[in-house]
Amino acid sequence: MAAKQLIFGDAARQSILKGVTLLTDAVKATLGPRGRNVVIERKFGSPNVTKDGVTVAKEIDLKEPFENMGAQLVREVASKTSDVAGDGTTTATVLAYAIYKEGLKYVSAGANSMDLKRGIDKAVEAVVEELKKISKPVVDKKEIAQVGTISANNDVSIGELIAEAMDKVGKDGVITVEEAKGMATTLDIVEGMQFDRGYISPYFITDPERLECILEDAFVLIHDKKISTMKDLLPILEQIARMGRPLLIIAEDVEGEALATLVVNKLRGVLQVCAVKAPGFGERRKAMLEDIAILTGGTVISEDIGLKLENVKVEDLGKAKKIIIDKDNTTIVEGAGDPQKIQARIKQIKVQIDETTSDYDREKLQERLAKLAGGVARINVGAATEAEMKEKKARVEDALNATRAAVEEGIVPGGGVALLRCQKALEKIKFENHDQQLGAEIVKKALEEPIKQIIANAGVEATLIVEKVKENKNINYGYDAYAEKFVDMMEAGIIDPTKVTRTALQNAASVAGLMLTTEVLVAEIPEEEKKPPMPSPDMY
């Protein structure tokens, strides 16, 4: 086991401060509409150009171990905020630095660090309550576009694309971000339920030009086992052939005699049919088949519930207005399921999302939710170069996360104004002692930092502008750093999601409080690299 080095008390906290300062200086340059770029070296390929705070923070590792601890703690603030709210990482970093730096002055002067932390926590609770009062719900497409635009560094086209995508697939829909092949950034909408299984045999194709099988006003047979013999399928196929309606068969697999018979009947024009494999695996497959059954108003034909394939009636089949199958995907449009049952299933999946601890399971549940709730949208990000593409894709993902957060908890005035307006909420709180009161003063001062940094990044003197904003009684009055003028932030479309602002402050205060109450730092003593011995003269 390697030997350890320890430092205590004020020396430990000062080392943390050095690391926090270095990381914050790198990250805060990206804040606001006039934020600067940070260029990050890559081992291979072109450097990464970014204005995303968490991307910068994740790249920083300091040589000095004690300073690095401080940097890593604040890095945690940025990544936690990104995980929960999807944006606000730079704001969180700036707030954590401001709270810690100010708090350290009082701790060094003899204040009780535990009381300071209690005061900070109490003040943050009051600010969060005030944010909820200021917050207003997002009601229309225009506001969604504004949130997206702000988060994408004032790129209006990205904001409008995200608003369009949300309008089409709803707030529970899945919106994915992909790299496009060309220079244009486009939006593709997949309406209905799509799953990643195509036709089992190309003989099922009905549109040879597009290599698709299209079934209009079709029945859907859903089975959870393999179908290999024809005698089980025969009764239901005869009924459907008499009705002259198309049929989609979804099963674990269709093979041998059963597949051959379906293909022959399709080619002879006796039956318009297509077979696809069931999506997913194991328990997830059962759940997805149940989703398809609920969406189409059918029943999963499973021996688990006493249903056999040879006894299937037309009433057990699902129905859909249109089904499109290509070699990779099946899309079911306008299933005939009972809307109440679909809503009940959506609620059930939402509960599972809240309860699961696995990120992978959560992602898969959200995909299922979206497929039931109305569809999938895909934003294809195009750019001239690979470096620009990566930077733009990161901005689109940020904007998408911020927009979701806005729909969830509403919006507040942007540009750091909302936090500044929350200062007045701290004047009403009663504290048990003077040190706790100081904790609230620390938070009060820190609430000014984001707006100051946004203005400073625009190359303007911040102090006078902040005072002018404070003096104005209109809660939405603030400074547009992009246009360099005073405006009503809500009317100008400069808005932040409440969830992003709240999460940034809570995470910043949490980590700053931990650092203030730190007394000892323990790190490994770095081993000196041993130099190789001098070569023997006889070697030459």
UniProtKB/Swiss-Prot annotation:
It catalyses: ATP + H2O + a folded polypeptide = ADP + phosphate + an unfolded polypeptide. NCBIfam families: GroEL, PRK00013.1, PRK12849.1, PRK12850.1, PRK12851.1. GO terms for cellular component: GroEL-GroES complex. GO terms for molecular function: ATP binding; ATP-dependent protein folding chaperone; isomerase activity; unfolded protein binding. PROSITE patterns: CHAPERONINS_CPN60. Together with its co-chaperonin GroES, plays an essential role in assisting protein folding. The GroEL-GroES system forms a nano-cage that allows encapsulation of the non-native substrate proteins and provides a physical environment optimized to promote and accelerate protein folding. Keywords: ATP-binding, Chaperone, Cytoplasm, Isomerase, Nucleotide-binding. This is Chaperonin GroEL. One of its GO terms (biological process) is protein refolding. It holds the Pfam family Cpn60_TCP1. It is found in: Cytoplasm. Forms a cylinder of 14 subunits composed of two heptameric rings stacked back-to-back. Interacts with the co-chaperonin GroES. Its EC number is 5.6.1.7. Belongs to the chaperonin (HSP60) family. It comes from Thermodesulfovibrio yellowstonii (strain ATCC 51303 / DSM 11347 / YP87). The keyword Zinc does not apply. InterPro entries: Chaperonin_Cpn60_CS (IPR018370), Cpn60/GroEL (IPR001844), Cpn60/GroEL/TCP-1 (IPR002423), GroEL-like_apical_dom_sf (IPR027409), GROEL-like_equatorial_sf (IPR027413), TCP-1-like_intermed_sf (IPR027410). The keyword Cell division does not apply. ATP binds at residues 30-33, 51, 87-91, 415, 496. It is an enzyme of class 5 (isomerase).
